[in-house]
Design a protein with these regions (language model features):
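Small-residue-rich helix-loop
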Residues: 222, 230-272
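NAD(P)+-binding Rossmann beta1-loop-alpha1 motif at the extreme N-terminus of oxidoreductases
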Residues: 1-48
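Rossmann-like NAD(P)(H) cofactor-binding subdomain of soluble oxidoreductases
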Residues: 74, 79-142
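Long, low-complexity C-terminal extensions of enzymes
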Residues: 254-258, 266-353, 360
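Short acidic low-complexity segments
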Residues: 55-69, 179
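Short, well-ordered alpha-helix to beta-strand connector turns
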Residues: 23, 56-57, 70, 96
Length: 367
């Protein structure tokens, strides 16, 4: 398959290398040509399973060149980059292409809405995963280490009516697990569950320099807040009628006896900690805050509210991160009301997510 991979971060490197090693024709796009010289000779993937030096079909700063002939466009970029990305994609997409966001934080709906509002071309479908396919860190100009891969990758499609055909194309690439729709996948994203508590409750240590929030920063007290947020996420999912698996953090990530049922499989947390790659310098500009807190938590809170599920821990985190960032987070970012869905009932939103831009309600949400 011809695959375009957009971005130059750790996730993009891991994606491009892994898919190229799997035999796909991969072209990588980055905004600046000066950033591409290092990968034109290939990207080295250090990982369990598939690994080695991956040769790319091309590496280019010309987005049109990267997208030309690509059946699949993978965007392993933070959700904070989606606004810029959609402006670039608008004139170039074709109605045969699939755009995959890894993960999406409900970006599949947000990007489709933004494209429609600005007159851009809509693809065949948007898809989004509920988590990162790889837990990875770049370790050199053309090297990336991915000690952990997703083994269960919840994947939602917008419009959900096109799920069968989209997942049939994605299944040879990833261990996709069918989600009901894009919001189902977005509410499986545990980044907003784990990262905001880890950052907030370790703020003092983080201010002191390099620190591993997943190791020293994960104490019993921190876990209590993570578990509370996850409990509210599960209540929201049930309120929306989404079926299991819910990928509960307490049992499918922190509990080794059930980790095989989780997003990353047995031993995932141990592999992450043993790698030492997450002993790093964090700040309020890190995606743990700008993406997982500002966007992910705002989505969780609004989804809970729409489903009449209580979310005091999520709301409290939003208020505190709003103070730290100096701006209001509640009702903004990826909150449903910020995406034109605030006036719709839960059942109307689910119908819209299924029918997509063919729905009579589409014109209301793109005003």
């Amino acid at each position: 398959m011809n695959v375009a991979v957009l971005g130059g971060g750790s996730g993009a490197f891991a994606t491009a290398a892994d898919l190229a090693l799997a035999g796909h024709r991969v072209r990588v796009w980055r905004r600046a040509d000066t950033e591409l010289a290092s990968v034109r000779g290939g990207i080295t993937l250090v990982a369990e399973g598939r690994h080695g030096v991956a040769r790319l079909d091309r590496a280019t700063a010309d987005l049109g060149e990267a997208l030309d002939g690509a059946a699949l466009i993978v965007a392993p970029v933070p959700a904070t980059a989606h606004d810029d990305l959609v402006k670039r994609l608008g004139p170039l997409l074709t109605e045969e292409q699939i755009v995959l966001l890894t993960p999406g934080t409900f970006g599949s709906f947000a990007l489709a809405r933004d494209l429609a509002r600005t007159g851009g071309r809509l693809p065949f479908a948007f898809a989004e995963t509920g988590t990162l396919p790889y837990l990875a860190r770049k370790t050199g100009p053309a090297e990336v280490k991915a000690p952990v891969r997703a083994t269960n990758l919840p994947t939602g499609v917008f419009p959900a009516a096109r799920t069968d055909s989209v997942l049939a194309k994605l299944a040879p690439l990833y261990p996709v697990r069918r989600s009901v729709d894009a919001l189902d996948a977005a509410l499986a994203n545990v980044g907003a569950v784990i990262h905001p508590p880890l950052v907030l409750l370790n703020a003092g240590a983080i201010d002191g320099g390099s620190f591993d929030v997943h190791a020293q920063g994960t104490t019993a007290s921190v876990r209590r807040l993570i578990d509370a947020v996850d409990g509210e996420r599960l209540a929201a999912r049930r309120g929306w009628g989404y079926p299991a698996p819910h990928y509960e953090m307490a049992t499918t990530y922190y509990d080794d006896s059930r980790a095989a049922e989780g997003l990353y499989g047995a031993g995932a947390r141990g592999k992450l900690l043993a790698s030492g790659l997450w002993n790093e310098t964090l700040s309020l500009e890190h995606r743990y805050v700008t993406e997982d807190a500002a966007l992910g938590l705002s989505l969780l809170e609004s989804a809970a509210r729409t489903a009449t599920a209580a979310s005091p821990a999520i709301s409290g985190l939003l208020l505190l991160f709003g103070v730290l960032l100096g701006r209001e987070l509640t009702g903004h970012g990826r909150a449903l009301e910020a995406l034109g869905l605030g006036d719709l009932a839960l059942r109307e939103i689910k119908t819209l997510l299924h029918d997509g831009w063919g729905s009579p309600m589409w014109s209301r949400v793109i005003r």
